Amino acid sequence: MNKVFSLKYSFLAKGFIAVSELARRVSVKGKLKSASSIIISPITIAIVSYAPPSLAATVNADISYQTFRDFAENKGAFIVGASNINIYDKNGVLVGVLDKAPMPDFSSATMNTGTLPPGDHTLYSPQYVVTAKHVNGSDIMSFGHIQNNYTVVGENNHNSLDIKIRRLNKIVTEVAPAEISSVGAVNGAYQEGGRFKAFYRLGGGLQYIKDKNGNLTPVYTNGGFLTGGTISALSSYNNGQMITAPTGDIFNPANGPLANYLNKGDSGSPLFAYDSLDKKWVLVGVLSSGSEHGNNWVVTTQDFLHQQPKHDFDKTISYDSEKGSLQWRYNKNSGVGTLSQESVVWDMHGKKGGDLNAGKNLQFTGNNGEIILHDSIDQGAGYLQFFDNYTVTSLTDQTWTGGGIITEKGVNVLWQVNGVNDDNLHKVGEGTLTVNGKGVNNGGLKVGDGTVILNQRPDDNGHKQAFSSINISSGRATVILSDANQVNPDKISWGYRGGTLDLNGNNVNFTRLQAADYGAIVSNNNKNKSELTLKLQTLNENDISVDVKTYEVFGGHGSPGDLYYVPASNTYFILKSKAYGPFFSDLDNTNVWQNVGHDRDKAIQIVKQQKIGESSQPYMFHGQLNGYMDVNIHPLSGKDVLTLDGSVNLPEGVITKKSGTLIFQGHPVIHAGMTTSAGQSDWENRQFTMDKLRLDAATFHLSRNAHMQGDISAANGSTVILGSSRVFTDKNDGTGNAVSSVEGSSIATTAGDQSYYSGNVLLENHSSLEVRENFTGGIEAYDSSVSVTSQNAIFDHVGSFVNSSLLLEKGAKLTAQSGIFTNNTMKIKENASLTLTGIPSVGKPGYYSPVTSTTEGIHLGERASLSVKNMGYLSSNITAENSAAIINLGDSNATIGKTDSPLFSTLMRGYNAVLQGNIMGPQSSVNMNNALWHSDRNSELKELKANDSQIELGVRGHFAKLRVKELIASNSVFLVHANNSQADQLNVTDKLQGSNNTILVDFFNKAANGTNVTLITAPKGSDENTFKAGTQQIGFSNITPEIRTENTDTATQWVLTGYQSVADARASKIATDFMDSGYKSFLTEVNNLNKRMGDLRDSQGDAGGWARIMNGTGSGESGYRDNYTHVQIGADRKHELNGIDLFTGALLTYTDNNASSQAFSGKTKSLGGGVYASGLFESGAYFDLIGKYLHHDNRYTLNFASLGERSYTSHSLYAGAEIGYRYHMSENTWVEPQMELVYGSVSGKSFNWKDQGMQLSMKDKDYHPLIGRTGVDVGRAFSGDTWKVTVRAGLGYQFDLLANGETVLQDASGKKHFKGEKDSRMLMNVGTNVEVKDNMRFGLELEKSAFGRYNIDNSINANFRYYF
């Protein structure tokens, strides 16, 4: 392109035309009646003679055009980092996979370049872009979104190649620069099989679609947009400075699945390559020329691209910490300044007149540097780059403006300088900028990388403002608030890809949320919790400033709602689209423009009212809420609806919504050039995690593609809809324009698009919950209602419904693993199903903990299903009326539904499932597998299938009937109750089938022979062997009913005629073992009875107090085990008599004894006291006497004969005497034979109860044990000047002289008497006594017994005595 003509984009010709430089600033004077009245001069001739194909980018017609657009803008499936992307043709056939590299980031290409097409410049450094040298015509360009405008202030053309560098007025904050290949211009560097594995391009020239027959179809671009695709491996020419690809054959697989070729309209657009060595995408070229035969790129080399920036730097400033602060002075008239440190002076250059490019960049090194501004600095386009920590301050409120600040990684710059009105401080770089100025800073901030800490200081009047506005973009930056008053929160916005606002433990109140996309983050990373308050409000006129733009004759881009002025007609128009055509061609198109007349003030007022109207629409926030904070959402002005389609990650946070509506939803996938809509099929999932969502008179929707984890508390008429179809979309989504919400309805059509909820819901005070999609958790409802339509609802926590309804709608499926409790009747509608199970074991697949569910009743609709299995226990009556419902009890799979807990196994009585309640379902079926059903009232069924199960009818005082048309039973038990004239009855009317079934009979009074009671009635001719009489243990006997079969004219009947009763030795043994447990407690006390007197013989002293603690365990027959802790305290006194030392004393005792066996477990607590005397003769003989009384509190649980838990009291008396003689073998060694006799009195106990209708009793009378013991102890004493230690060991034999009472057991078969048995055992002990002072003694003894039916396994006895 020469200097006389420039390429201009023609909206009329839908392409570029050559336009004289003299026409660049065309203005139309005079009053225009309409756009059609304009005469276009010679430019029109150029348009007419223009040949479209010569300026085209052409793509494959077999693939959706949208795919090429999404590719170029990183939208749809082509998000940054995506891999293995499938490419489909228009018929849905897979035509290729982008699997050679992850998807690159194309955001470094321009989104808008004035009248030039997008994508013709590429940012490769924070302030520099590269393009083709022949690309001219616009100095304005934007990145990320078209609103983010930058101005070209300088450029550098290559002297021989078609490439140039352009400098921008500011550092770009919205996007990250593209990385430049380090390979550069090397012949063959980009050929197939080399280091670079994939080549992608994009551009915004005129677009064409080409079919396999070579036919071209133009695509109307409405202002230009980007497309992109794959390029084949490249060959080099011109000494490697140029690369080319034969891309004309776009149907050749060698060119990739998204092959396309470019022409002049895409000049300057970038070519990216994936460097397999460095594992990254790099910029390798810019388009210079092309045709259908191939494209040619100028290789982007680091040498050239770094050439111009080097010219834009003044000398690097190196701070010397020994020379004081750097003094910065500046002359705004000359645009020249200095930074000096003592005698060292560095020159700097700033804006000169209107020339921003005169401003040079400055680099700073030297750690902990200090800079003081003596003058306000206007550095033009020059920026500051810090490689070390610095403090920058002003002498007297001087300001700084320029291209921006770069802080390198690990660097912290303390910035104490304010900015100026209408200027933004641009900040990038991974390091930190700490803003610490004073007073009110009128400048704004745009940050795109690293960290900015806002710590502005107040002025003398207490006023402070870190910035007038803040924009966070590119997704790489974080702004941290040191306090809540650093900036007006409503002046914070998040631009392209957003960034993080860290509340830093502060409480912040927003009335506006300005977030462009999902990259916007509000977080708190401080250990102190923050509160984010949203009091969102509609705009008011004072908040709105309207910029009146001048209409560009050659067309252009804008944002819907922008106000334009057409001077030729003195008319104001509001733009309704994102672009407009040239030469006033579409001013009459009401889809593009709204004519608002000739009055400027009125036009501005209309714009304001439109913006206010849009802001009153339901609110949306596309961003993220993260960290340690609560969110409080107040009633919102306008329409009180807030939709979050970003994400929430507040594991310890509470979100509160008062009135209005809150919606969590997924996000519709953004496609290039398309407005998102509720009706589109592709949505992105979003995660919402919080501790709790609290609703007060509010409505909450969890809509499609939203996954929520956290509890919900809903009160005061709140409504919760989990799986809602209500959604909102933003018609400006992906454009950077203000949110404009649109309400819609969208139902997920795949499981992956459905909502998922995990948590517990609390409903109070007339609130409601609708579970429509995936639910895992629990529900507590009080005076509220719950309905389920989901086919995947799981209660893994308790479901409790107090004065509340639970309704399963048509087709719903609910599984409750932790029980359901309600005082209302549950309703299960047509084709709905409810499954009740136990709690699955985490570590043992197939194992469950039993869980009980209790309801007032369950009503089943047509073809509804109720299943109780895998340790599920249901207590409820069930009605199905005339519905053909199905009830499944138990599970036949032997590998699941088990429990390894004996307690739980007893609850379930060994079955997989239990139902307690009657069923009224004349048209319904019940299937039982390894299940127990107890119908205590009448039940009626169409069909009953039972396998390895048990059916129990009736309850004491009430006989029940089970009426069933068809009964198919195998290996099952039917238990009925009977007296001598009546019984529960099973009535089979149509069909009886099965085998190996057992009839058990519980009786309500003493069984009598000669009865004649019908138990089962079946159709005539039924197999008499279907049932047989079974034996069951009742009380202490095995009872077998006598049943005969009778055939009548109409039926076969099983008739009860009597019983056979045989004593059950095992049951009797269990009972007597329990009754005998009192003796074992008595024996424990006996063994501890005379310990104190034995101590006296080893440590004679005067009067004193003592304490003793003993702990031991014992075991006996039938699995009996006990462990006890015994405590004694007492005092005694020595009386010296003639030839004898007599000790007398008193003691108090407490024993905590835990005992268990295979059939019982419990605790006995004993409290008592006694007196004792011990006489020690000078000859060595001694005697011991003791008497003691104990009161016992007993509580035991017995799992035999339905006895259950029993609490009772008892008491015992002890009288003991021991004599012995201590023979001294030497002065310190002795042997002591001894003999002891203990007589006692133990109170009896009595129990009366019923087991399966049988009256039982179990009692023993008071009895009087007499226990003897003989033995011998040996001991030796060791002593020093102030201490004495005595050690001893003993061996003895303990035996019963009298039998231990009598136990009487009584059941329907009569009384059974069991005499107590004598027992004996060997005793062994070792011990020691230590005298550490004249008045203190310590003792320790270990004891064990053997060879008895009951033995002490181990016992340890520790004592302490203090002499007065």
From Swiss-Prot:
Residues 1098-1364 form the Autotransporter domain. Transmembrane segments: none annotated. Changing residue 134 to R: Loss of activity. The keyword Transit peptide does not apply. Residues 57-307 form the Peptidase S6 domain. Residues 1-56 form the signal peptide. GO terms for cellular component: cell outer membrane; cell surface; extracellular region; periplasmic space. Its EC number is 3.4.21.-. Keywords: Cell outer membrane, Hydrolase, Membrane, Periplasm, Plasmid, Protease, Secreted, Serine protease, Signal, Transmembrane, Transmembrane beta strand, Virulence, Zymogen. The active site is at 134 (charge relay system), 162 (charge relay system), 267 (charge relay system). One of its GO terms (biological process) is proteolysis. It comes from the Bacteria. Cleaved to release the mature protein from the outer membrane. Inhibited by phenylmethylsulfonyl fluoride. The record marks 1098-1099 as: Cleavage. GO terms for molecular function: serine-type endopeptidase activity. InterPro entries: Autotransporte_beta, Autotransporte_beta_dom_sf, Autotransporter_pectin_lyase_C, Bact_Autotransporter_VF, OM_autotransptr_brl_dom, Pectin_lyase_fold/virulence, Peptidase_S1_PA, Peptidase_S6. Changing residue 162 to A: Loss of activity. SMART domains: Autotransporter. Gene3D superfamilies: 2.160.20.20, 2.40.10.120, Autotransporter beta-domain. Leads to accelerated virulence in the rabbit ileal loop model of infection. Nevertheless, the relationship between the enzymatic and potential virulence functions is uncertain. Autotransporter serine protease probably involved in virulence. The signal peptide, cleaved at the inner membrane, guides the autotransporter protein to the periplasmic space. Then, insertion of the C-terminal translocator domain in the outer membrane forms a hydrophilic pore for the translocation of the passenger domain to the bacterial cell surface, with subsequent cleavage. PANTHER family: ADHESION AND PENETRATION PROTEIN AUTOTRANSPORTER, AUTOTRANSPORTER. This is Serine protease EatA. The lineage of its organism: Bacteria, Pseudomonadati, Pseudomonadota, Gammaproteobacteria, Enterobacterales.
